[in-house]
Amino acid sequence: MARPQPQPSKTKTHKASDEVQVERLHKGYAQSMEITKVLADEKSKYQHIRIFDTVANGRVMTLDDIVQITSRDESAYADMLTHLPMLEHGKVERVMIVGGGDLSIADEALKHKNVKEVVLVDIDGDVIRLCKKHFGAINAKAFKDKRMTVEVADAFEYLGRKSSKNRFDLIIADRPDPVGPGKALFGETFYDRVKGALKPGGYATFQTGVPFYQPWEITEALQELARFFPKSGLYLSVVPTYIGGFMALSWATKGGNALGTEKGIKKAAKAYKKIKLQCDYYNPAIHAATFALPNWIAKLVP
């Protein structure tokens, strides 16, 4: 079942909240959210974690004051990183999620009955603990699913283990921006390890920034992917609270078909209907359209 989405207040005016969360990820631009209740405010070994309810965006988690997930628009991110490659592949059994401690992506992957194993590897156990407590509407089913394994570990190191070699049909990199502990999840060594952990014919998908404010991420990521994978590319989603409009998602395959071909899109639409997949964002029409790039984004593709 699709998850119920919280709605903003219908009142035209409201009393301003006493506390406001301000995000300043991009130079010269900021977004703010009025907070109604703070649920968690902790500093882990790696980052400052806050979870709070808001007037307009539902429940929100920030890491070092940068929005990571909101209950209102998480599906636009999780659905597209997950279902698009899974439906075009058609036989995904083993999935690894790099990061993703809120388990929103894991929840989507587990909707596919042919999946035998989902392994989520996040370096910050406090993120996992707090998300389990406060984002149950999103992740409660995933935490209870016997196919789900949660590892508190360095995903970069995990990918390099002998036990990870040729293990996964799909690897989803729900990585943060390339700062702090997230730096290791970018660059040639990371992509080489992803390739090594994929089965032949497997796919990987990656968060690749907001092109309006981070255009270089697309060019750099696709250049690096092309060094390790015979086929790779770009597609888009729209996640309102990831400021900047379009969200860039990249893909690569270890010997599989290119994503987004006419044949692949038809295959995915047929599978979507057959398994009666229910999503808040993804559908076959979105799948077909997501590979269309505005000219200014297409110019960023090397």
What are these regions (language model features)?
Residues 10-20, 44, 69-203, 213-217, ...:
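The AdoMet/dcAdoMet-binding core of the Class I SAM-like
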Residues 34-37, 47, 156, 233-238:
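Glycine-rich, charged/polar anion/phosphate-binding loops
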Residues 58-59, 157, 257-259:
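Glycine-centered loop/turn positions within well-structured domains
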Residues 62-63:
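A general beta-strand register signal
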